Amino acid sequence: HETDMSNSFQKYYKNSKNKLGKKLIEAIERGMKYSASQYTEAKDFMEQSYRSYSEVFEDYHGVITPASTGVADKGLKFTGSPEFCTVWTYMGLPSISLPLLTGENNLPLGVQLVGNKLDDLRFLGVANWLEKKCKDDE
């Protein structure tokens, strides 16, 4: 993940590092620490992970998971930890967080829907259906 990002941002890192944020610079630098063989090994493992998980989509159009450890923070300074979406991003699967529930102080509590690789149209249809279904049941 960080190696991909590091590769994508190399030009900006080399030419305009002073214009990048501290966290982005740190992530780019972490990504630069991996060799090409380590990167290839990780990509192979990622593909194996997807193949072992893809059987789920033979029977289901999507998987519902938590989107976070709790309700959203007030304001927009922090959007939350990516820990609940990282595994799906890692496997190349589409995911979306839907604010279907509410928690403390009436703040949204996201539900994450995960779809199959290269099946985005169906995935978006399922997300739309799920959101409407939950609102209809309120």
Where are these regions (language model features)?
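Structural helix-boundary/capping segments
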Residues: 34, 39-44, 90-138
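Short, surface-exposed loop/helix-turn segments at secondary-structure junctions
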Residues: 41, 68-87
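Small-aliphatic-rich amphipathic alpha-helix that forms the alpha element of a beta-alpha
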Residues: 52-54, 79-99
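Short helix-loop capping/hinge segments that flank enzyme active sites or metal/cofactor-binding pockets
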Residues: 1-50, 54, 99-110
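Amphipathic alpha-helical segments in well-structured domains
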Residues: 2, 6, 81-84, 127
